[in-house]
């Protein structure tokens, strides 16, 4: 195996067939927001940079959410209600490391979330620039970022009901020109107190493969919680500090040795930092830190990891994770079919 990392994008979600062509530059939404250009394109819609015509000089980021075209009118109505409920919660959030949500609305079967435009570069771009120079990101710098990211996640998870981001990755973390970290892209945020999993699936999407734990596969939203974010956070720090993208959870499920020890890829990583990363990336949620505060204690060297993980066996994983069992069966059958062709 080569010791050079294979540079990959954040493995962005597959763009849904519902996502049509973006609005033309100059389009005005809600008689207030003039779109300048597309700054991102995700699984459920586009993200635009816009000028606020009511407050000259203010720039906004507008997240577009488009429901699947085959949905019944009733499911479309539920999807819109879910969006409005989530957006109203997000608009109440106020934290220095989160962009402020200032408005939300629906127009022509699409929902829009308006938030502050965050200038600067995302951590994926900084990682790629460091790689191009033949360098690795400095651990002290990454831990400085970690302080701010963890503070934002702690704030989200303390809400009532708790708010889980569900798509933490280097590309969704921005560093502003004044050195502040912003956790962006609320497109996959999920509130834990929901009754209709179908609506959640319609609105949310499914995260990003390299940073997504096994319980999040298949849109099984009822089994995700704060520990889902902790896995993604650990995977993000793994990538930032090793310069190697982590193997996705499906690969790790079939091959537990696929995840290489962080210090084997970068000897400058402190032992306690490597320990925290591997703890956060445990396959079973019960084996991970149960809060970001627990994760932070080990990451910053305040405490050692309390308990070792249970022995990881395929049989135990199958018994405890129905989604994983179905996934493993599907992969096995696919391998058999390909062998026979």
Predicted regions and their residues:
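C-terminal lobe helix-coil module of Hanks-type protein kinase domains
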Residues: 210-306
